[in-house]
Amino acid sequence: MTLSFYTHKNHTREREREREREREIMSTLTGPPVPPSPRDDAVQLHRAFKGFGCDNEAVINIIAHRDATQRALIQHEYKYMYSEDLFKRLASELHGKLEIAVLCWMHDPAGRDATILQQGLSSYTVNLQSVTEVLCSRTPSQIYTLKQIYHSMFGVYLENDIEQQTLGDHKKILLAYVTTPRSEGFEVDRELVERDAKALFKAGEKKLGTDEKTFIRIFSERSRAHLVAIDSSYRNMYGNSLKKAVKSETSGKFELALLTILQCAHNPAKYFAKVLHKAMTGLGTDDTTLIRVIVTRTEIDMQYIKAEYQKKYRKSLNDAVHSETSGHYRSFLLSLLGPNR
């Protein structure tokens, strides 16, 4: 029993180390070869705030080149040295889109997701697209942590806010997705895959109307690997992709949730490349989405997103962002995106 317990713990630690190494490879974050101490960074930031106006360039040169752990240590040192909250000082010194982007970046990943969700579920700033994107693109372990952080930050359960601010089948899929345990492994039960593909066909394209309950059950209970296998089986049996079936059988925010879950099961980087392109297409730029995606994915898989963007749109993501933004706001986002290669 004891040996089994420690073996399991060792395997868990090894998986975490592998994920950490993978994140480092996929991240676009660049930093100095020998990072200054958090204390030195705190001193330099304090200097940047002094005098007439804020030295935005100095702030970007530090903040945009430190990882989540380093940023947390800088905030701790700043508070200790100057008896002042760095987050609040940044909010008072920066303005406009640069302020929004930097403050979003200063959070740790789970705290950032919780903040995005809380703002998206607020009666004053409701943004169900951002809520759907964040919830339906995160892994079960990320959602588990996120729910705990959400409650500790805002004193209310995430499920309660979803219940209050969403409607119908959109509400049902979000609640099911954040409360149902799912495997993060790659094991697939082929018999169950075939049964699920048949059930989805029977619930959608085969009948007049749609049995939304079946879509909600399967999309919320099955792992990403299992959903990818269902899609392949569905295509083989019925000559149509599951994505097309979802588009023809559902609509609105419910459709958005199902498509986000399915596309992130296949290829999260490709999904986010599409989201970024849409944010920069048409009249004006959707800066809220641009900031949210770049800031939340920089330390996770932005290298992959950049590659998918280049592949699909024949233009680098850096060039696209450069043409749609300006000033220090542009400099900050491009710093997060790393070299244009």
Where are these regions (language model features)?
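Intrinsically disordered, low-complexity terminal segments enriched in Ser/Thr
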Residues: 2-23
